[in-house]
């Protein structure tokens, strides 16, 4: 039997990657791990208790909040505030960033941005959902409340990013800039165990993930790329396979393991794209680049975009390097 390495043990062993770290980042990820266990427990019994469905409230984007969105947001926020490594949190579910006011929190080095429950509308049909998180070092002075500028940093400033996928098994996948590592939750032991070390996305793939129901509203370059994907060319492994779950974490996770591309382009309804730069695109972009892939908005690298507002949206193309490059070629050829 091979040695079991838990998430906590792995993080401690990797602390030498941060010569100036004193354990705060490791403890911060421990807070995320704790909240993930709590949310996972609630998701697993969602069909048995009155926690699925709409809460009756809307978030800043005008989207109907699900009850579990609110629950997950509260649990992650509470777990992060309870320890002294985080001075503030920005969430897709909150209009503004939240600065933690306790003195210990104001002395913290980090801020966290999160989508507490991505794909939550799928819960009542038992489809995988997830949590996405992003960690930055604050730029405001230590000992003062966090400011909005702490959160409006380009993605290449992230010190860590990751996601938790709640599915047939629950996994936590994260990077601190030294590889992408996945941990599977063992409910009998109550721990996340290392199951996927140094994850790498294949340079090529044959899976494309896009909501083809929006086809008539896509830019011409995307329409032409989809035709390319569907053409029969056995010599270069086409036609490709269409796989779209409607949960970013689930689609991303599959493509990371098998090779593929996830596309959410601009549409007539969402000319700037629909996905949030800070809560979804930046953390996934850091992960995919660490795994050897690419992430762009169709024109530039996602991690180079300087955000102008907390809930900024962008088009998003992420996955295997050669597939992202091919999308760019079509967008360039058919650009207005």
UniProtKB/Swiss-Prot annotation:
Its main location: cytoplasm. It catalyses: beta-D-fructose 1,6-bisphosphate + H2O = beta-D-fructose 6-phosphate + phosphate. The keyword Cytoplasm applies. It comes from the Bacteria. Mg(2+) 1 binds at residues 92, 115, 117. Binds 2 magnesium ions per subunit. Mg(2+) 2 binds at residues 115, 118, 280. GO terms for molecular function: fructose 1,6-bisphosphate 1-phosphatase activity; magnesium ion binding. SUPFAM superfamilies: Carbohydrate phosphatase. Its EC number is 3.1.3.11. GO terms for cellular component: cytosol. The keyword Glycoprotein does not apply. It is an enzyme of class 3 (hydrolase). Pfam families: FBPase, FBPase_C. PROSITE patterns: FBPASE (PS00124). Its cofactor is Mg(2+). Pathway: Carbohydrate biosynthesis; gluconeogenesis. Belongs to the FBPase class 1 family. This is Fructose-1,6-bisphosphatase class 1. It comes from Aliivibrio fischeri (strain MJ11).
């Amino acid at each position: 039997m091979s040695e079991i390495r838990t998430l906590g043990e792995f993080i401690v062993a990797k602390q030498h990657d941060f010569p100036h770290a004193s354990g705060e980042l490791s403890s911060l990820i421990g807070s995320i791990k704790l909240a993930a266990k709590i949310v996972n427990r609630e998701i697993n019994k969602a069909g048995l208790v009155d926690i699925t469905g709409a809460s009756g409230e809307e978030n800043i984007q005008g989207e109907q909040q699900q009850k579990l969105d609110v629950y997950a947001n509260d649990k992650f926020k509470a777990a992060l505030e309870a320890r002294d490594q985080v001075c503030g949190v920005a969430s897709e579910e909150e209009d503004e960033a939240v600065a933690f006011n306790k003195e210990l929190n104001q002395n913290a080095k980090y801020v966290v941005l999160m989508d507490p429950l991505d794909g939550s509308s799928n819960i009542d049909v038992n489809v995988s959902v997830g949590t996405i998180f992003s960690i930055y070092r604050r730029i405001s002075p230590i000992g003062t409340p966090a400011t909005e500028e702490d959160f409006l940093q380009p993605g290449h400033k992230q010190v860590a990013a990751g996601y938790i996928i709640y599915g047939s098994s629950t996994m936590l996948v994260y990077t601190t800039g030294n590889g992408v590592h996945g941990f599977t939750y063992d409910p009998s032991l109550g721990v996340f165990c290392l199951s996927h070390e140094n994850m790498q996305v294949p340079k090529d793939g044959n899976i494309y993930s896009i909501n083809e129901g929006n086809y008539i509203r896509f830019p011409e370059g995307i329409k032409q790329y989809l035709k390319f994907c569907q053409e029969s060319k056995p010599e270069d492994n086409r036609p490709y396979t269409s796989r779209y779950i409607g949960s970013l974490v689930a689609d991303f996770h599959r493509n990371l393991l098998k090779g593929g591309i996830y596309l959410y382009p601009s549409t007539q309804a969402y000319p700037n794209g629909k996905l949030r730069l800070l809560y979804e695109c930046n953390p996934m972009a850091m992960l995919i680049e660490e795994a050897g892939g690419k992430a762009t908005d169709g024109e530039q690298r996602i991690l180079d975009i300087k955000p102008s507002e907390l809930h900024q949206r962008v088009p998003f193309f992420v996955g295997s390097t050669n597939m992202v490059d091919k999308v760019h070629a079509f967008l360039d050829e058919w650009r207005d």
